[in-house]
């Protein structure tokens, strides 16, 4: 089934674009990683479409959604409000009581969890796929009293800001990127989807990233503005928390969040940060296994150890 593109208006004046795979099944709402777009989640969406009506949004500043000026147009709370507006519109048009599955990759996982914390019961269950969880001040002090732990976000933001936004063609971007470690880890079709939908055509014949470098950098720099540790106790839905075994995010922060979430199951598969683009089959396997667990049976926050998949 080919998805159709839709647009949802928010009370903040944003228009959020989305890819809708259609059908009358329970809804799975997907949120991509920073710098990506909803179309890049197609490999996961297509595999889930037998069980769910899958809708993958473009966050503001990404894909074909509204792109206000940075940095002021990108408060982290705005991403949560945008996603909630789309979820509520879908519930209104279908008559469903809850979104069956909220699935977020990287920063999308934080956005999904914060939306559930704000509006308890919005989701039947959620999945956070290697979300950017960094130690807060208290955890950082406990892990390293000497103060040697350095927050990587300013450096990552600076790197994103230097990214080349305009290219002669998609072919030139492909040639420059295809051997870089991040893109080599992706499934070939995921890379092609990013080239196709992550760029827009310009009138001068060149192509330009839809997610501007200053937008991506703003999100990296301010991703800690959403206090997921404080919000965790308000997340009533069962949570699948996935830490990428080959990722670079601190395991201690994941373990801390696991303890704080009321109903959390954690998995540590041997895969890199962008699971849906690198390992869509494994990603769907993890999602389906968690979906098969009765909603009330997710591991309690104080019980069980992280396991591998």
Residue ranges, per PLM feature:
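Catalytic histidine-centered segment of alpha/beta-hydrolase-like enzymes
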Residues: 271-284
């Amino acid at each position: 089934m080919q998805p159709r593109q839709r647009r949802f208006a928010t009370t903040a004046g944003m228009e959020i674009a989305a890819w809708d795979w259609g059908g009358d099944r329970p809804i799975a709402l997907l949120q991509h990683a920073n710098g990506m777009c909803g179309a890049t989640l197609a490999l996961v969406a297509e595999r889930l479409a037998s069980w769910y009506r899958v809708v993958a949004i473009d966050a503001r500043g990404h894909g074909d959604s509204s792109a206000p000026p940075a940095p002021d147009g990108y408060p982290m709370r705005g991403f949560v409000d945008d996603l909630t507006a789309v979820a509520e519109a879908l519930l209104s048009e279908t008559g469903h009581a809850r979104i069956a599955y909220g699935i977020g990759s990287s920063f999308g996982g934080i956005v999904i969890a914060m939306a559930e914390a704000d509006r308890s019961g919005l989701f039947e269950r959620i999945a956070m796929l290697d979300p950017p969880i960094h130690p807060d001040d208290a955890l950082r002090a406990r892990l390293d009293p000497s103060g040697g732990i350095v927050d990587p976000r300013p450096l990552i933001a600076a790197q994103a800001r230097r990214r080349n936004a305009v290219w002669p063609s998609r072919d030139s971007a492909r040639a420059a990127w295809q051997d870089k470690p991040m893109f080599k880890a992706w499934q070939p079709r995921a890379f092609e989807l990013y080239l196709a939908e992550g760029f827009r055509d310009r009138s001068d014949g060149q192509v330009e990233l839809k997610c501007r470098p200053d937008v991506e950098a703003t999100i990296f720099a301010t991703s800690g503005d959403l206090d997921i540790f404080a919000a965790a106790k308000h997340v009533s839905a069962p949570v699948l928390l996935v830490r990428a075994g080959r990722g670079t995010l601190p395991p201690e922060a994941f373990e801390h969040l696991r303890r704080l979430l009321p109903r959390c199951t954690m998995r540590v598969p041997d895969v890199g940060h962008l699971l849906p683009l690198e390992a869509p089959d494994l990603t769907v396997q993890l999602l389906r296994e968690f979906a098969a667990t009765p909603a009330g049976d997710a591991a309690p926050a104080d019980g069980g150890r992280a396991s591998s998949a």
